[in-house]
């Protein structure tokens, strides 16, 4: 067991945030490939890497609770598919990142409904602030919302459900969970790819797909390293840095600049996430003190 080191935990979580935003950007690079092809290839690479990591860490390849691991894998797979659907040529990387960040709010709501957890007042307020931010990003006009926006929001929703299931899998290795999730994604995507037919891949496509899978595996690895140095209650808020990285990546590599309405919505979403983090931590402290 490592000695607690918050600074190292924060550092590795910032590395993870950069990798997550890079993964989203790489998904956009190959926008012309079908969603299921991107999911299949990237998951295949990530599954191979995570399988090797499991062997290196002497962790099992199959989780003990197959029902929960199946739920986590299904929700994670749906989130990935929707994330790639949102990653079109014209949709902003920053918006994809922000909408996927709604996972923390949806995880909070899922924990209340499924795990029967109690929400602190600040967390209730954070939900309303988050949905105000979501409305600014979605910006429905005349009852119409962009398909990419709905896909990004759906990705956040299913990711939130997946993270809630992971909390029930606390006795399982994170490497095993991720290997099962990636393997499930490969198997689930294959029938769709076979029906659509495989697209011819050049060196660029092969390189980007391998890099995407490697970045995903690295993100999962560094996430585990970060939480081995410090508990999530102390450092998880730094995951919101991925939105800043996505914003910068969008400007530098895609020449994208969100308008002030989307930026305002993003600020509300990030603010809601930070409020949720602080309120949840304070509620935990009070509960521990009462006990």
Regions found by a protein language model. Give the residues of each.
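C-terminal-most transmembrane helix of multi-pass membrane proteins
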Residues: 2, 42, 240, 244-291
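Hydrophobic/small/kink-forming positions within alpha-helical transmembrane segments
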Residues: 17, 21, 25, 51, ...
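C-terminal transmembrane-helix exit sites in multi-pass transporters
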Residues: 57-58, 103-125, 244-263
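Hydrophobic transmembrane alpha-helices of multi-pass small-molecule transport proteins
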Residues: 122-138, 155, 261-280
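Helix-helix packing/entry segments at the starts of transmembrane helices
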Residues: 96-102, 169-184, 220-252
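Loop-to-transmembrane-helix transition segments
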Residues: 7-16, 55-84, 146-157, 193, ...
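Glycine-/small-residue-enriched transmembrane alpha-helix faces in small-molecule transporters
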Residues: 1-37, 143-168, 285-291
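Membrane-interface helix-cap regions at the ends of transmembrane helices
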Residues: 2-3, 46-65, 75, 130-144, ...
């Amino acid at each position: 067991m490592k000695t607690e080191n918050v600074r190292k935990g924060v550092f590795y979580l910032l590395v993870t945030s950069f990798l997550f935003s890079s993964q989203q950007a790489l998904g956009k690079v190959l926008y012309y490939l079908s969603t299921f092809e991107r999911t299949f290839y990237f998951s295949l690479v990530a599954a191979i890497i995570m399988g090797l990591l499991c062997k290196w860490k002497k962790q099992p390849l199959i989780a003990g609770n197959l029902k929960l691991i199946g739920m986590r894998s299904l929700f994670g797979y749906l989130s990935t598919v929707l994330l790639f659907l949102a990653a079109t040529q014209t949709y902003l990387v920053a918006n994809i990142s922000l909408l996927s960040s709604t996972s923390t709010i949806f995880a909070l709501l899922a924990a209340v409904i499924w795990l029967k957890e109690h929400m602190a007042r600040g967390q209730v307020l954070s939900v309303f602030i988050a949905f105000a931010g979501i409305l600014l990003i979605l910006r429905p006009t005349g009852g119409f919302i962009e398909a990419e926006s709905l896909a990004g929001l759906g990705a956040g929703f299913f990711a939130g459900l997946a993270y809630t299931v992971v909390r029930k899998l606390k006795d399982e290795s994170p490497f095993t969970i991720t290997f099962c999730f990636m393997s499930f994604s490969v198997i689930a995507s294959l029938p769709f790819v076979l029906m659509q037919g495989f697209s011819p891949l050049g060196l660029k496509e092969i390189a980007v797909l391998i890099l995407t899978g490697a970045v995903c595996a690295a993100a999962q690895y560094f996430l585990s390293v970060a939480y081995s140095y410090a508990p999530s209650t102390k450092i998880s808020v730094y995951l919101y840095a991925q939105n800043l990285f996505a914003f910068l990546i969008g400007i530098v590599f895609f020449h994208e600049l969100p308008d002030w309405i989307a930026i305002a919505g993003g600020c509300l979403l990030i603010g809601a996430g930070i409020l949720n983090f602080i309120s949840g931590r304070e509620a935990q402290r009070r509960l521990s003190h009462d006990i």
